[in-house]
């Protein structure tokens, strides 16, 4: 396999943050010697998450075995995932905002056609449903654990407790038609075909669409981590990957 130098479009605070967390982890478990330093392990993990490179390619580039690369990356991802903010913590910080934006996105996977629970009829592909909360400026605040793609957005929001938690905090949420009937403080557009809506309802829907569209940058931010654009791992690991990416994003934006 040929090896070549490559760049990573991340800032040094990402590397310093993860390196420090890995050093703490090594001290906690009493790890003495490893093939890679904490800094190199952090760089390996960031390259995997940001660029989506497979373990074999990364292993060749870092001069380690594929199994070792997998083990190092899994350890670092678990460390990051444990630091991701909970929904309650996000709601507390969002209580000062006028409203939040709620939307769902599908993270495509390489599931086969027989895996019906992971097939999204809306997106016509297999994947995992992740709910996203953003502030009024479109900045990513929180991403939920991943559920099978066949689950509709409103059901996913309920299962994660998003509807009740934000309602209890009195925080208004703007969402699309996929959340119709959610209740609480969720604001959705007027239901019906455009031509059957009154002039006032059409105006409301246009205004609603402009506000709700602000969530798109938050979803795009999540998917700048290229690994999430086409997941080839076990579905049981996807929640950890999403939480790890969320931790790194919030670290870099602070």
Sequence positions of predicted segments:
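Short, flexible segments with low predicted structural confidence
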Residues: 15-16, 29-31, 40-43, 66, ...
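Short, amphipathic alpha-helical "recognition" segments used to contact nucleic acids or chromatin
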Residues: 37-51
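Short, well-ordered secondary-structure "scaffold" segments embedded in the functional core
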Residues: 57-74, 78-254
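A cross-family signal for key residues in well-ordered alpha-helices
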Residues: 19, 46, 158
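Short secondary-structure transition/capping motifs
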Residues: 7, 33, 47, 62-65, ...
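Charged, often Cys/His-bearing segments associated with DNA-binding zinc-finger transcription factors
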Residues: 1-32
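Ser/Thr-centered flexible coil motifs
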Residues: 11, 37, 196-199
């Amino acid at each position: 396999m040929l090896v070549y130098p490559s760049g990573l479009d991340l800032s040094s605070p990402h590397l310093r943050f993860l390196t420090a967390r890995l050093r703490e982890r090594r001290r906690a478990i009493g790890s003495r010697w490893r093939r890679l330093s904490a800094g190199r392990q952090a760089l390996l993990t960031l390259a995997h998450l940001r660029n989506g490179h497979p373990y074999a390619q990364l292993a060749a580039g870092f001069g380690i075995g594929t199994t070792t690369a997998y083990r190092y990356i899994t350890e670092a991802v678990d460390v990051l995932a444990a630091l991701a903010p909970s929904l309650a913590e996000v709601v507390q910080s969002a209580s000062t905002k006028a409203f939040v934006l709620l939307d769902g996105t599908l993270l495509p996977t390489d599931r086969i056609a027989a895996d019906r629970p992971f097939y999204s009829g809306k997106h016509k592909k297999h994947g995992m449903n992740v709910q996203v909360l953003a502030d009024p400026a479109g900045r990513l605040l929180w991403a939920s654990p991943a559920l099978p793609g066949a689950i509709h957005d409103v059901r996913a929001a309920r299962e994660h407790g998003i509807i009740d938690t934000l309602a209890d905090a009195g925080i208004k949420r703007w969402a699309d038609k996929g959340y119709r009937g959610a209740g609480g403080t969720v604001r959705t557009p007027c239901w019906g075909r455009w031509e059957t809506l009154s002039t006032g309802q059409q105006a409301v829907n246009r205004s609603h669409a402009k506000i709700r569209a602000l969530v798109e940058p938050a979803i795009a931010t999540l998917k700048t981590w290229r690994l999430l654009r086409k997941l080839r791992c076990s579905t049981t690991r996807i929640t950890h990957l999403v939480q790890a990416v969320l931790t790194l994003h919030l670290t870099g934006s602070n």
